[in-house]
Amino acid sequence: MAFKGVLNDADVTAALDGCKSAFDHKAFFKACGLAAKSADDIKKAFAIIDQDKSGFIEEDELKLFLQNFCAGARALSDAETKAFLKAGDSDGDGKIGVDEFAAMVKH
């Protein structure tokens, strides 16, 4: 698992189970334990999710967000992806930077 040492496997499994039918980023971050983690751990999570290492999480990476936690997890729907991007993209540039991600995880 990519998040070994950052998140508890059982918490991640429970969080993934909770979003099989609908994705709510706030509920997911809380359930998987990321919301309670340190700034350094949140940056580590960001680096894992930023698949192309661009320094940003773009829409295509958000669509596959859950698969970072478990390879067999579902892709987010287009509507879920757009809502997730809108929630995290505070400066309106169409992508989520590390500071935006940290703010989204914590709130």
UniProtKB/Swiss-Prot annotation:
The free-text tissue note of the record is:
Expressed in both white and dark muscles (at protein level). About five times lower expression in the dark muscle than in the white muscle (at protein level).
Q: Which InterPro entries match?
A: EF-hand-dom_pair, EF_Hand_1_Ca_BS, EF_hand_dom, Parvalbumin
Q: Which residues cross the membrane?
A: none
Domain called EF-hand: residue spans: 37-72, 76-107
Lineage, top-rank taxon, reads Eukaryota
Pfam families recorded: EF-hand_7
What is one term from the GO cellular component aspect held by the record?
A: cytoplasm
Residues that, per the record, bind Ca(2+) 1? 50, 52, 54, 56, 58, 61
Q: Name one GO molecular function term.
A: calcium ion binding
Q: Where does Ca(2+) 2 bind?
A: 89, 91, 93, 95, 100
Which keywords label this protein?
A: Allergen, Calcium, Metal-binding, Muscle protein, Repeat
Does the UniProt entry include the keyword Metal-binding? yes
Asked if the record carries the keyword Calcium, the reply is yes
Query: What role does this protein play?
Result: In muscle, parvalbumin is thought to be involved in relaxation after contraction. It binds two calcium ions.
**According to its UniProt record, which protein family does this protein belong to?**
Belongs to the parvalbumin family.
Q: What PANTHER family does this protein map onto? A: PARVALBUMIN (PTHR11653:SF12), PARVALBUMIN ALPHA (PTHR11653)
* Protein name per the record: Parvalbumin beta
